[in-house]
Amino acid sequence: MISLLRARLRQGRQTLDFPAGPVPLPERFRGRPVLDGSKCQEGCRACVAVCPTEAIRTDPLAIDLGACLFCAACQEACLTGAVSYTPDYRLATRVREDLVVSGAEAKLATALDDAMRSLLGRSLKLRQVSAGGCSGCEAELAALGNVVFDLGRFGIQFVASPRHADGIVITGPVTGHMELALRETYQAIPAPKIVIAVGACAISGGPFAGAASSGDGVPADIPVDLYVPGCPPHPLTLLDGLLRLTGRIRAGTR
């Protein structure tokens, strides 16, 4: 016991002061891309050619973050600097179309309506379903529970039973073998409920889009309340999206 107490005193406080404090990110972190179509050379489609998920289009230049793997192959292929990645981790949106980036403007997630926020704003229980994922997004979601991010201090927890949940977090491209399980889990969650799509696979199918054994993300008849792009998204991207959805981070404050 004494050794544990000494270690605790030596290590100090490890939990990030988020969202109020500074946000430490790795030097190589790739966040929101910034595009400048005026730098594009006429007829050049180098970035389009190297994108593994066809997330980029030209005329006008735009990137679909819902399909983007953040591999930065487009940035390396662009000789004029029209595409660059910033350390901005704020990527989550409420609307699928807002994930299409065509400049430097960021369209961030907004809060739930007053009625839903009064129910879920301070206590949100989520059931996670890995619908054919590679465990990348699942690992980042699990990291939210460690001492650094401490998701529980915001009243947000993952639960084992959909009957105890207020919403569902979906990862993976939704393979044929997982679609029924996903639908049954969604149906088992009491209304009103929310749906959160995490990662490129859940949003668009990611690199598996169009594959015979997988879908193109969350089925169209399941309404999504929050999209969190990335491959996988950083825990801070996930936390930022959840706090914006529940009204803990208000629009224009950060």
Language-model regions: role of each:
Residues M1-V50, E54-D59, E76, G81, ...:
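Non-ligating segments of multi-cofactor redox enzymes
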Residues K39-T53, A67-T80, R127-A142, A200-P207, ...:
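Local cysteine-cluster metal-coordination motifs and their immediate loop/turn environment
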Residues D59-C68:
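Short linker/helix segments within small regulatory modules
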Residues A111-Q157:
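Conserved small-residue-rich
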Residues A139-L141, N146-F149, R153-L239:
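Cofactor-cradling patches in redox/metallo enzymes
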Residues S204, L242, G252:
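Long C-terminal interaction/binding lobes of large macromolecular proteins
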